[in-house]
């Protein structure tokens, strides 16, 4: 039986044909729009929002996610340009009654400093599952997931792609397949290992279904946990923890790297654990906690 096509694909194809026929866009530009808008429309679909009903807040949340996954400012600017053109097209063609992207502006092409939690905020967030549902079915899953994200600094896509074969808990390592299927070994602390073992032994066997396969983190139906579900779990626990900063699964990665560097970890070692191909991508974490840098200067500089 053929897979049902998402309704937004037809709208996207109509827009791309308009770009080619009416505005003489090149094949490369068309391909860029296909990639950028495909990601945006798939995200809206996963959120349960139709393109013609999107609000400015939806677009801003999507742009925030682009920041959180580490997309360069120039790429984000290109995405915004595509989104603005798309919604303008929907309004012109009377496929929508408003243009939610009209007042969405291009970011300045400067380095984006990601949101990072303090060590105290992270501790509060990691305890939130115990406060939210200490006797609930999903407490073990949510607690294990949050602890694992912070302990390893893995991307959410890497987390959701984990299988039992990737875990080497007796050795204190996890095998991760990152961007471009690049493989790396990342250490896992004992606290995260303890919660992962409890989840895997006490909860996951009862959650499994025919669609579970070997995926570590499962949803309530026994299928693989989706990216959006992981986002919701993080945000719901952030509310419980009283954290008002913008937060996503990627915040754990940013905080992981920042806290390691604050503790004196070597930049190259952190680069290896994060799976960055370039040291430049890791260096951003040396510029985040200005208060920490000031404190170091005050403590160690003779004129501090």
Swiss-Prot record:
> Which GO molecular function entries does the Swiss-Prot or TrEMBL record give?
DNA binding; tyrosine-based site-specific recombinase activity
A GO BP term here is: cell division
Identify the residues that the record assigns to the Core-binding (CB) domain, covering every copy.
Answer: 6-91
GO annotations of cellular component type: cytoplasm
Keywords, ordered alphabetically = Cell cycle, Cell division, Chromosome partition, Cytoplasm, DNA integration, DNA recombination, DNA-binding
What is its quaternary makeup? Forms a cyclic heterotetrameric complex composed of two molecules of XerC and two molecules of XerD.
Descriptive protein name:
Tyrosine recombinase XerD
Name the source organism.
Chlorobaculum tepidum (strain ATCC 49652 / DSM 12025 / NBRC 103806 / TLS)
